[in-house]
Regions:
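Alpha-helical transmembrane segments of multi-pass small-molecule/ion transporters
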Residues: 1-70, 75-298, 303-369
């Protein structure tokens, strides 16, 4: 019996999201031009700080993260939590193998650039909690499993990100006889940044879902409220990138080879982690949908959080922040390509694709079981 083929990934995106790589490139170009053409802009933006954190960057990050976290169904954890193979494998990939791989790649490719190396290590610690939902839907992954893994990663990041940053930037390099991060690195600063930039939108998203469903019902919340706030995630992302590139424009233009060197380990990281997730899911017989979810939640990184931590800890014009800024430029095209790779790999999984249960980017309550 011939099975239906899933629709092309590009056809499953809304108009603005379909052109996301282009919007990101335009935001970067706009930021670079503004930084070069408007005298004193970088100084003015850098002066807008609260508690040592850039106010424009903070606003952009919070606006971007809230809509995505408001989509998560925090109460539906039972069935997925009972899938021990998925949960254990996800935890190992996300919190053991992926940070260790990024640590190794950062030292292999950037041994002479400590600021960029530190930025990449921070990126490796920030597990994706935003765009992964889109990649998962495009690849026909398990939406509820993605929601659970995103929620768990969100909570785990609030609790453990600071300690892991301290371990990979100070403890492990010391054990291996490598140079450690400068004394300016602060475990407290990392933890505060995570609590502010992840904890606030996480709490706001959870409270919004509880209050929205209780007052107006799930149909209204998912069919009306979420579509209204959804575009603001893109606006916040583009605003943040534009501001960062306005601040970093001189460095980007002056050091294109450094930017290229930052990009290389990121590409290797995405490909290796995604392949590991798909292979482990196939070996463990998780089924295609949950395997795709496992691979994308492991491969994607929360560059928004990494940028926030780098900016809050090392400064808005630091090399660490630049390493985080390069992230979205590399992540978006690579993960779009991996969506196609996942759909191609679908033929190697026993469960046939079913259009009746394929996820959509803008689900309503009636689409849910």
């Amino acid at each position: 019996m011939k099975t239906a083929a899933p629709p092309a990934p590009a056809a499953r995106l809304s108009g603005p999201d379909r052109w996301l790589p282009l919007w990101i490139l335009l935001a970067m170009a706009a930021g670079l031009l503004l930084g070069q053409q408007v005298p004193g802009l970088s100084t003015a933006l850098d002066g807008l700080q609260v508690a040592g954190v850039s106010l424009p960057i903070a606003v952009g990050l919070l606006v971007m993260m809230y809509p995505v976290l408001a989509k998560v169904r925090y109460t539906q954890t039972g069935a997925v939590l009972r899938d021990r193979k998925l949960m254990v494998t996800s935890l190992i990939l996300n919190w053991v193998l992926s940070p260790a791989l990024m640590f190794a790649l950062a030292w292999i490719f950037l041994p002479d650039l400590p600021d960029y190396r530190t930025g990449l290590i921070i990126v490796g610690l920030a597990r994706c909690i935003a765009m992964v939902m889109i990649w998962n839907d495009l690849a026909c992954g398990d939406r509820e499993a993605a929601a659970v893994l995103v929620a768990l990663n969100s909570v785990f990041q609030v609790v453990a990100f600071g300690a892991l940053g301290w371990f990979y930037l100070q403890v492990l390099p010391g054990w291996l006889g490598l140079s450690v991060t400068s004394a300016e690195f602060s475990l407290t600063a990392i933890t505060v940044s995570v609590l502010v930039f992840l904890g606030i939108p996480l709490l706001a998203g959870a409270l919004s879902r509880v209050a929205g469903e209780r007052i107006r019902g799930r149909d209204w919340y998912e069919g009306t409220f979420l579509p209204r706030i959804g575009p603001w995630a893109l606006y916040g992302l583009l605003f943040t990138i534009a501001v960062l590139f306005a601040l970093q424009g001189t460095q980007v233009i002056a050091r294109p080879l450094d930017v290229a060197r930052i990009a290389v380990p990121l590409v290797v990281y995405f490909l290796v982690v995604f392949a590991a997730g798909m292979l482990l899911g196939r070996i463990l017989d998780l089924g295609y949908a949950r395997t795709a979810t496992l691979a994308f939640t492991a491969a994607g990184n929360n560059f928004e959080l990494a940028i926030a931590v780098a900016v809050g800890t090392f400064g808005v014009t630091s090399g660490q922040a630049l390493a985080g800024v390069v992230g979205p430029l590399i992540e978006v095209p690579i993960l779009v390509a991996l969506v196609y790779a996942a759909l191609w790999a679908r033929r190697f999984f026993p469960t046939p694709y079913s259009p009746a249960v394929s996820p959509s980017l803008s689900p309503t309550a009636k689409d849910r079981p």
